[in-house]
From Swiss-Prot:
One of its GO terms (cellular component) is cell surface. GO terms for molecular function: identical protein binding; MHC class I protein complex binding; protein kinase binding. The chain crosses the membrane at residues 190-210. A lipid is attached at residue 211 (S-palmitoyl cysteine). This is T-cell surface glycoprotein CD8 alpha chain. Keywords: Adaptive immunity, Cell membrane, Disulfide bond, Glycoprotein, Immunity, Immunoglobulin domain, Lipoprotein, Membrane, Palmitate, Signal, Transmembrane, Transmembrane helix. Integral membrane glycoprotein that plays an essential role in the immune response and serves multiple functions in responses against both external and internal offenses. In T-cells, functions primarily as a coreceptor for MHC class I molecule:peptide complex. The antigens presented by class I peptides are derived from cytosolic proteins while class II derived from extracellular proteins. Interacts simultaneously with the T-cell receptor (TCR) and the MHC class I proteins presented by antigen presenting cells (APCs). In turn, recruits the Src kinase LCK to the vicinity of the TCR-CD3 complex. It comes from Rattus norvegicus. Disulfide bonds join 47-119. Residues 150-170 are annotated as: Disordered. Glycans are attached at residues 63, 144, 148, 152, 158, 160. SMART domains: IG (SM00409). It comes from the Eukaryota. It is found in: Cell membrane.
Length: 236
């Protein structure tokens, strides 16, 4: 009997898209409308029959990765019995009836169970189908925050003159001047002019000493001749 039901459903559900558009009405209500499941999570779907005139409910599944329109029969459940598809694991799928609600339980969700689930009932020789419920793996989206660049600090204006090489003679923002000296890069701009001035002064002093020494050698140190007085000058 169960195999006949499976064959009957398989033949009638080849035109699933057309049938669902024609027969989906207020007879069936499926909840939740969408499921984002994690791997290993238990998933429960509830098919509520608003007019309980059916003898049972069938759960079906359409794989999202399959190109075939034919869905896969999962389980048939009624108030007295339930029949699972022979190719499915009984530890994975189970179903039960509570009043006018038919509950399908997927014990451990995996990627191969992703797809669209729906239920079907037969009432007065008419098949009714519920809307498709997408059941897919939950995607954890990672939101990256934009990186904002810190504004470049502007140094305050100062009244002191800028050095010739500020990058060499001025310490950095995080650096510190170590030791007593300013460093060779800065000392050369201070001592070079001083050394030049000292050299000019020394050269001037040497030239002055040489000139003075030559002038002293030109002075005649010979004794002066004695001038004898004339006779006319003696008896005046």
């Amino acid at each position: 009997m169960a195999s006949r039901v499976i064959c009957f459903l398989s033949l009638n559900l080849l035109l699933l898209d057309v049938i669902t558009r024609l027969q989906v009405s207020g007879q069936l209500q499926l909840s939740p409308k969408k499921v984002d499941a994690e791997i290993g999570q238990e998933v429960k779907l509830t098919c509520e029959v608003l007019r309980d005139t059916s003898q049972g409910c069938s759960w079906l599944f359409r794989n999202s990765s399959s190109e075939l329109l034919q869905p896969t029969f999962i389980i048939y459940v009624s108030s007295s019995r339930s029949k699972l598809n022979d190719i499915l694991d009984p530890n994975l799928f189970s179903a039960r009836k509570e009043n006018n609600k038919y509950i399908l339980t997927l014990s451990k969700f995996s990627t191969k169970n992703q797809g669209y689930y729906f239920c079907s009932i037969t009432s007065n020789s008419v098949m009714y189908f519920s809307p498709l419920v997408p059941v897919f793996q939950k995607v954890n989206s990672i939101i990256t925050k934009p990186v904002t660049r810190a504004p470049t600090p502007v140094p305050p204006p100062t009244g002191t003159p800028r050095p010739l090489r500020p990058e060499a003679c001025r310490p950095g923002a995080s650096g510190s001047v170590e030791g007593m000296g300013l460093g060779f890069a800065c000392d050369i701009y201070i001592w070079a002019p001083l050394a030049g001035i000292c050299a000019v002064l020394l050269l001037s002093l040497v030239i002055t000493l040489i000139c003075c020494h030559r002038n002293r050698r030109r002075v005649c140190k010979c004794p002066r001749p004695l001038v004898k007085p004339r006779p006319s000058e003696k008896f005046v």
